[in-house]
């Protein structure tokens, strides 16, 4: 089985200059934890995850808490977060895979790197995203005990 067989095609993406609030809203509305960050040419430039957003929100809060009072801390963190762009919190230079790579290889990369997803790139452009859930769904369809069940409705 290849990555192409399991990946999410045409994943939801975000621009590096989008406000962090837009990333939060998009992830919440679309119920995703990973957003590939692409430039205006569709080239992958990085990834922003729910973990990146938590770090962007809470790291300044801790610094503020240690250096100021609690009331001023919350006001300052809110203002800082509102001014931040995706590029300020995203991960640059992410590990990628190709559509034709074996899914087992992509899964091994995800496990070893502790990645929740891998962008799928062809010719420098994002064509898909393979997530932990995609790998589990693909695995579930190969197990004899669950063959015949619809993984989109029966298991999740």
Question: Where is each model-derived feature located?
Answer:
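Tandem CBS (Cystathionine beta-synthase) repeat/Bateman regulatory domains
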Residues: 1-156
């Amino acid at each position: 089985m290849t990555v192409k067989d399991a990946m999410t095609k045409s994943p939801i993406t975000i621009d590096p200059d989008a406000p962090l609030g837009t990333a939060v809203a998009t992830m919440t509305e679309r119920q995703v934890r990973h957003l590939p960050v692409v430039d205006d040419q569709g080239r992958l430039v990085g990834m922003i995850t729910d973990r990146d957003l938590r770090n962007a929100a809470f790291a300044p809060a801790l610094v503020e808490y240690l250096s100021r009072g609690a009331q001023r801390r919350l006001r300052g963190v809110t203002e800082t977060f509102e001014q931040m762009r995706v590029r300020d919190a995203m991960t640059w230079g992410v590990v990628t895979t190709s559509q034709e790579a074996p899914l087992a290889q992509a899964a091994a990369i995800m496990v070893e790197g502790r990645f929740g997803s891998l962008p799928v790139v062809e010719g420098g452009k994002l064509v898909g995203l393979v997530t932990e859930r995609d790998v589990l769904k693909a695995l579930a369809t190969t197990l004899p005990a669950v063959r015949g069940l619809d993984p989109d409705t029966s298991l999740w």
